[in-house]
Amino acid sequence: MNILVTGAKGMVGTALCNNLKNIRDGKNKTHPALDIKEIYEYDLDSTPAELDEYCQKADFVFNLAGVNRPENPEDFMKGNFGFASDLLNCLKKHNNKATIMLSSSIQATLAGRFGNSEYGRSKKAGEELFFQYAQETGAKVAVYRFVNLMGHSRPKYNSAVSTFCWAVANDEPFTVNDRSTELELLYIDDLVEGMFDLLEGKEQHCEFDGVETVLKADGRYCCVPVTHKVTLGEIVDLLQEFKAQPTTLMMPKMPDGSFAKKLYSLYLTYLPTDKFKYALKMNVDNRGSFTELVHTADCGQVSINISKPGITKGQHWHNSKWELFIVVAGHGLIQERNINTGETVEFEVSGDKIEAVHMIPGWTHNIINLSETENLVTVMTCNEIFNPNHPDTFFEPV
C-alpha cells in the first residue's frame, strides 16, 4: 500500500507519518494487516509535479492540508476548499479511485457558536466537494469533523492546551479568562489509532446533532469517538500538579485512557531541556542513604535505600504498614521475626537474582549488607506515604 499524506508537516501529519513509518519499518507490529510500502509526504514546500506523481501512485490518501489562521478570512476558502479541488482533480486525472480521508472540523456543522465561522464554511464546502467526488467516481471518502485537537503544536497559536502546557512548563505567565469554559478534546494518539482503523476498514461512523457527535453505523461522517470534555480550570489545575511533582514527588492519578494521562505526556513535551533532570532529597548518614522517589495517593511510595558494607538497617515492625524490599545491587540478608509467636525467617538476596521480599505487618525486620566492599542497593515500596503524625513504626531488634 502506498499512502499520500497532505499537510504532512503539521501537527497531525507529523504524528501520523511517524507512526505510519513505524508500521512500514516493522517497529509497530500491532497492525499486521497493514502492508505499507511508500509514504508520500506532501506539504507547502512540495511541488505540483510531486503532487501529480503521488496522486498517480497512491492507494490511500490522508488529506490533512488546510489553513486555520490566515491573514485574510477569504484565504480560508482558498486554503481549504481550493487545495481540496486541486487534489481531487489530480486523482481524477489519473483515474485513481484510492480511498481518501478528509480532515474537517466540528466548525463545519455551522451550529451554535460556529454559526458565523468562515473557517467552518470553508470546511463545509470542502466536505461537500468530497461527497460529490465520491458519487462521481465511486471512490470511498471518509470525512472526519474533528473537535479541538490535543498534541504537540506551536504555543500561542491555535491551541489553548498547548499554550497552557508551554507556559506552565516554562514558567511563563498565562491567563484563563473563564475557568468554567469547556473544551471537547481529541488526543493525537487516539486520532492516529483512528486512522489505522480507517486503513483497516474498521472506522466508526456518525451523524451530528448540532455540534454533538451521534454514533450511527450508516452515518455520513466518520469519527474517532475517544474524546474528553474538560474545563479550562481542570486543565490548568492538572498542569500545576504536574509542575509540582518533582518537588512533592506526588504522581497525580492517571488511569489508563484518562485525560490526565494524556495531558501529562503532552506537558512533558514542552519541558525545557534543563528540566529533564531534577534533584531528589537524599537522606544521608554514616550507614548510607535513603531517597524517596515517587509518591502516589493510592499506592504509597517508592524509595531507594543504600546500605554501606556491613551495615544493618531496619530493626522495626509495623501494625498495618507493609513493604516490599527488592535488592538490585549487592549481596544482603533480610531477616524477619513474628513479634507474637517468635517465628523467624531469613532470605539471602542479591542483585544477581532480583527477587521481591514482603515485610509483613507484625513481623520485625532488618536488612544486612553482607559485603565487605560493596554497597547494597534496595528498591523499597511501601503501601503508604510516611506520616510523621502516624508513623506506625516501632523499634524492635530481630
Question: Predicted segment positions?
Answer:
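Double-stranded beta-helix
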Residues: 341-343, 368-398
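Conserved Rossmann-fold NAD(P)-dependent oxidoreductase catalytic core, especially the SDR/UDP-sugar
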Residues: 85-124, 137, 142
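NAD(P)H-binding glycine-rich loop region in Rossmannoid oxidoreductase-like domains
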Residues: 44-82, 86, 90-93, 107-114
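Short acidic-glycine-tyrosine-enriched beta hairpin
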Residues: 338-363
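N-terminal Rossmann NAD(P)H-binding glycine-rich loop of SDR-like oxidoreductase domains
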Residues: 1-26
